[in-house]
């Protein structure tokens, strides 16, 4: 069985989506980097900003958020009562200074739709104490399987990849893309 994949990276605008075989489904999707670092590193009032981001997600069927590191409770306070949020991996105790993936996927879909979210952490990163410091986050991706009420399935990928402009950053992103492709191929073989 061939699966349908919708691969989205770093889009800041909503858009309408595709058809599956003979049935048309139209979604409003938001992909947004929330800039959710701890307050000590930013000065844009995340305690005020994150509930507003949560409220904005109510206008979309699917919201794929990145950098939801430190203000998830504030974000959740703005969600609709029917909203379903899946937060990415939270890291491990081996690095107490490291944060989780920062990924959050929020769904406002009609009744009868099934959502299954798998979180994967990248094996490669670039930057501990210089550059973008991406190794302090357990960055990765979410493979989201959505099943319609009539059992049509499709997948969406939410990811937050390595930042930076150095060769080591580009190499890490290349490895991260390979990781995503490998995970997709495993799904296609099922």
Model regions: which residues?
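Structured beta-strand-rich core segments of catalytic domains in phosphoester-bond hydrolases
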Residues: 62-155, 159-161
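N-terminal, active-site-proximal structural segment of metallo-dependent hydrolase catalytic domains
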Residues: 2, 17-79, 91-100, 152-154, ...
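A short acidic, helix-capping loop that chelates divalent metal ions and anchors anionic groups
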Residues: 37-40, 128-129, 164-167
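N-terminal non-cleavable signal-anchor helices
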Residues: 14, 18, 182-185
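Sec-dependent N-terminal signal peptides
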Residues: 4-14
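Structured helix-beta-strand junction loops
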Residues: 59-60, 109, 187-190
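His/acidic metal-ligating clusters that form di-metal
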Residues: 140-159, 169-190
